[in-house]
Amino acid sequence: MSLATVGNNLDSRYTMASGIRRQINKVFPTHWSFMLGEIALYSFIVLLLTGVYLTLFFDPSITKVIYDGGYLPLNGVEMSRAYATALDISFEVRGGLFIRQMHHWAALLFVVSMLVHMLRIFFTGAFRRPREANWIIGVVLIILGMAEGFMGYSLPDDLLSGVGLRIMSAIIVGLPIIGTWMHWLIFGGDFPSDLMLDRFYIAHVLIIPAILLGLIAAHLALVWYQKHTQFPGAGRTENNVIGIRIMPLFAVKAVAFGLIVFGFLALLAGVTTINAIWNLGPYNPSQVSAGSQPDVYMLWTDGAARVMPAWELYLGNYTIPAVFWVAVMLGILVVLLVTYPFIERKFTGDDAHHNLLQRPRDVPVRTSLGVMALVFYILLTVSGGNDVYAMQFHVSLNAMTWIGRIGLIVGPAIAYFITYRLCIGLQRSDREVLEHGIETGIIKQMPNGAFIEVHQPLGPVDDHGHPIPLPYAGAAVPKQMNQLGYAEVETRGGFFGPDPEDIRAKAKEIEHANHIEEANTLRALNEANIERDKNEGKN
């Protein structure tokens, strides 16, 4: 039975052909920034594949054993079975270290790509109506991704992961009234408890991945149903999408890009070492030291705990420690992230549906707020390693702490002001080109002796030869002659590849035309010289 016969039989029963044809003809934009979400998706797939392999050999038990494995420096040392099996994966399981490091690199790439993807969504206004739900799903995905990563690198029960868990325990216990109950719910007792790794393991390999899968599916379904956003441009409106069809071109590109991400992670895992737990030793509560930093996506929370002043609050019989304010700050940031689309809609009064994106320069307030938040995040991340910087650069740790505190107040305000002025300046630059044209670099002398630069109009001119100002449509404004097809041709090739065939053909035509013009000029000059010589001979 042929595939055509099978397809006809299915279509006669379920009438699937028209729906499938319509779906595989769906169009996706080709802008490079849309690949950021794909990186997160492919990283998550790598996480699932490598995580399944690691679960075959890992034992999350905190039961104490005497290590007698392949890493000789730790032989005879008492440790938990979790740490011992993590060492066995690294040194005795075939390909275990490679898979473990690939899993760790994929976790970093997963969270970081989601953060960068969220920045793209924010700065281009892709969260506006009707996509508020997808924005909320994205925020929840980032929070769950960070929690999943934190639980993942806490499972080996090495010294660094134990320090991170101790900090988390202190923050939870510091919550007034509910802190103790939440701590017992999460850790199963006082820290360290016999149940904490078992509970983290179940959450890490079952509960959170299942939620992530459901949210990713919902996220992609909404993108598919609501159509993709796109940047303004020629022929692009709020009611269409210009790009490539999902079959076959987009599908082929997606598979190829997924393989590139997989290969990049494999390369990182093969040539770089990350989370060398054998150098840290098993967790011991008495061995907390400097230089204990979490992964980069959680470093900002550690920085917040480091720069927070030691403000303790006493309410009756309750003592609220300083780390409580860190939890409050995290909660406020999450609430602001979730509600930002509605806050912006409230202040701007914009309740329309939007399928076209915005250039960041066109919304200076939002762009400035985003840069301000980004600077705040970067300063907290840098503060998370203030002890390392103090030791490496021989600076006082107290000075580094105060630099972080002052920077968190002054830095975002300065970033807001500079970004706002840059956006206004870029808007003026675009409108100047639309009004006067593109600078050609050609200097012309006026009858009065003044020199001016000749501009190439982007549109029609009036009766006096002056360009008629064009309206700004939200798309990128050309600033160079070769972007208009002048000044030879626009070059689209790169270091690793030639120009496209049409560009090369056009370049050859221009070169040939220039050669003919040069030959004609030389011929005319030669004829003029011959004629002049004849006239001089007659005289």
UniProtKB/Swiss-Prot annotation:
A Gene Ontology term for the protein's cellular component: plasma membrane
DNA-binding recorded as keyword: no
Function (record text): Cytochrome b subunit of the cytochrome bc1 complex, an essential component of the respiratory electron transport chain required for ATP synthesis. The bc1 complex catalyzes the oxidation of menaquinol and the reduction of cytochrome c in the respiratory chain. The bc1 complex operates through a Q-cycle mechanism that couples electron transfer to generation of the proton gradient that drives ATP synthesis.
Chief localization: membrane
The record's free-text note on cofactor binding: Binds 2 heme groups non-covalently per subunit.
InterPro entries: Cyt_b/b6_N, Cytb/b6-like_sf, Di-haem_cyt_TM
Its EC number(s): 7.1.1.8
Protein's gene: qcrB
The keyword Iron is assigned to this record: yes
Source superkingdom: Bacteria
Subunit organization: The cytochrome bc1 complex is composed of a cytochrome b (QcrB), the Rieske iron-sulfur protein (QcrA) and a diheme cytochrome c (QcrC) subunit. The bc1 complex forms a supercomplex with cytochrome c oxidase (cytochrome aa3).
Membrane topology, record value: Multi-pass membrane protein
Compartments in which it is found: Cell membrane
Names of required cofactors: heme
Binding-site residues for heme 2, renumbered to this chain: H117, H219
Entry GO MF terms: metal ion binding; ubiquinol-cytochrome-c reductase activity
Family recorded in the similarity comment: Belongs to the cytochrome b family.
A Pfam cross-reference name: Cytochrom_B_N_2
PROSITE patterns: CYTB_NTER
Name listed for the protein in its UniProt record: Cytochrome bc1 complex cytochrome b subunit
Keywords: Cell membrane, Electron transport, Heme, Iron, Membrane, Metal-binding, Respiratory chain, Translocase, Transmembrane, Transmembrane helix, Transport
Catalysed transformations (reactions): a quinol + 2 Fe(III)-[cytochrome c](out) = a quinone + 2 Fe(II)-[cytochrome c](out) + 2 H(+)(out)
First-level EC class: translocase
Residues binding heme 1: H103, H204
TM ranges: 38-58, 107-127, 135-155, 167-187, 205-225, 254-274, 323-343, 369-389, 406-426
SUPFAM superfamilies tied to this protein: Transmembrane di-heme cytochromes
Phenotype when the gene is knocked out: Cells lacking qcrCAB show strongly impaired growth in glucose minimal medium, which indicates that the bc1-aa3 pathway is the main route of respiration under these conditions.
